[in-house]
Amino acid sequence: MSTMTPAEIVSELDKHIIGQAKAKKAVAVALRNRWRRQQVAEPLRQEITPKNILMIGPTGVGKTEIARRLAKLADAPFIKIEATKFTEVGYVGRDVDSIVRDLIEISVKQTRETEMRKVRSKATDLAEDRILDVLLPQPRAVGFGASAEHANDDNNATRQTFRKRLREGQLDDKEIELDIEQPAVGMDIMAPPGMEEMTEQIRSMFSNLGSGKKQRRKVKIREALKLLTDEEAAKMLNDEEVKTKAVQNVEQNGIVFLDEIDKITSRNHEGGGGEVSRQGVQRDLLPLVEGTTINTKYGMVKTDHILFIASGAFHLAKPSDLIPELQGRFPIRVELDSLSVKDFEAILVATDASLVKQYQALLATEDVKLEFADDGIRRLAEIAYAVNEKTENIGARRLYTVIEKLLEEVSFAAGNHAGQSVTIDSAYVDRALGEVSKDEDLSRYVL
């Protein structure tokens, strides 16, 4: 679990997302409250439930990006899913309980990796021993006394020399034959609606087939060391302990990001079949968000303390179109702002992995130096903003379309211009995009 303060979390998010200070603060405080709750004494700790967040804002302003970056910072079980994937129980499609099942799978994988890192050093030593046993088989006993001791000393000295060479990577490309444990057979079974639990049991039954069998393989020492380290680390793990920790981690620290929640609202009150299904998904989500117990293959999982962050553009609907019970489960509401020309400029150059840096790095692989003048950046931002205003407003995603069109010729002919420099100024931008951006009909299809 992350121990970062809200200010540190916001600072990390600022490296990748421009603006949206209110949304960043809300998720930073929510994430910090997870840690604060763990410091509270037990009787009161159970009573402190997370305050779920509803993020409202137009498409392309950073809602999903905040979730993606938060997942990396959280150091906790985190899942991002689209609400549109789910249907009411009884309809064809996934039911909402699968959210928790997917989250527990993520947690088990996360917990297993954490536990394996703890024993990695010891597992590496054991893996090295197994490789050295193949390279230097133990000599037969030659008798007793001084001669046997001398042979053992020689063997140990040779073994240490080879271990040193192995650690320095001098033997990486040498091939050896090893008995390597086969991974369990993977089998995917399509689950009929409402029968996910039974399908999960069948899948786990088949997954045990073939596990534990060994196969003789010829591999390079570099690969052998990795395979044997993983095998030795897995032997040291207690699977039951991993499962218990994973379930506890989900229950206490789990975070679910529900994207596109506005798409399951009732947009009118005519009560068509689609409306019934959408309301049904909301009703199914309600106990999950409120706190319930879900049966998974790793045991029962309580959702009382899982944090839910929902987001939606709410173009055609309003948050008040959600059923009242669900509205009440998202007490913190944050509105994200539409992007301005200044924001577009910052997105192009100010973030850690900005679009400009990405394209410069891509073309540098062909020895083409791409330079952006300040007036070129400004003009590019103005065109993206203007096209958004005249056509559909898709936020920062418009920049991808505009910059792709701008660099179309440069990217195509990069191989012929090795060693050259290309400067993108306002005149270049106008030449490449001017006509297209002015013609509204054309910009609808091209930009």
From Swiss-Prot:
Subunit structure: A double ring-shaped homohexamer of HslV is capped on each side by a ring-shaped HslU homohexamer. The assembly of the HslU/HslV complex is dependent on binding of ATP.
Pfam families xref list: AAA, AAA_2
Single Gene Ontology BP annotation: protein unfolding
Official protein name in the record: ATP-dependent protease ATPase subunit HslU
Tagged with keyword Transmembrane helix: no
Subcellular location: Cytoplasm
GO molecular function, one term: ATP binding
Protein residues bound to ATP: 18, 60-65, 259, 325, 397
HAMAP family: HslU (MF_00249)
UniProt-listed InterPro entries: AAA+_ATPase, ATP-dep_Clp_protease_ClpX, ATPase_AAA_core, Clp_ATPase_C, HslU, P-loop_NTPase
Source domain of life: Bacteria
Main localization category: cytoplasm
The protein's role, per its UniProt record: ATPase subunit of a proteasome-like degradation complex; this subunit has chaperone activity. The binding of ATP and its subsequent hydrolysis by HslU are essential for unfolding of protein substrates subsequently hydrolyzed by HslV. HslU recognizes the N-terminal part of its protein substrates and unfolds these before they are guided to HslV for hydrolysis.
Entry's family note: Belongs to the ClpX chaperone family. HslU subfamily.
Keyword tags: ATP-binding, Chaperone, Cytoplasm, Nucleotide-binding, Stress response
One CC-aspect GO term: HslUV protease complex
